[in-house]
Amino acid sequence: MLNQIIARKKEHIQTLQLPVDGHFERRSFKEALMNPHRSIGLIAEVKKASPSKGIIQPNFDPLQTAKA
């Protein structure tokens, strides 16, 4: 039984290997973000304050900041 598990795991690992030349097709970052087939184009962080700088934006509106 253990030998079967090991054999299946080895097969699975082989499917995860890099291509022979080690290169992947390069894509445009902008095109990847604007792809209509994806629901999320960008994940961003907006902050009112920083631990080292304190308040960055006193009148903080996260939605407006994210849209800007």
From Swiss-Prot:
SUPFAM superfamilies: Ribulose-phoshate binding barrel. Pathway: Amino-acid biosynthesis; L-tryptophan biosynthesis; L-tryptophan from chorismate: step 4/5. It catalyses: 1-(2-carboxyphenylamino)-1-deoxy-D-ribulose 5-phosphate + H(+) = (1S,2R)-1-C-(indol-3-yl)glycerol 3-phosphate + CO2 + H2O. The keyword Amino-acid biosynthesis applies. It comes from Bacillus pumilus. GO terms for biological process: L-tryptophan biosynthetic process. It is an enzyme of class 4 (lyase). PROSITE patterns: IGPS (PS00614). Its EC number is 4.1.1.48. This is Indole-3-glycerol phosphate synthase. Belongs to the TrpC family.
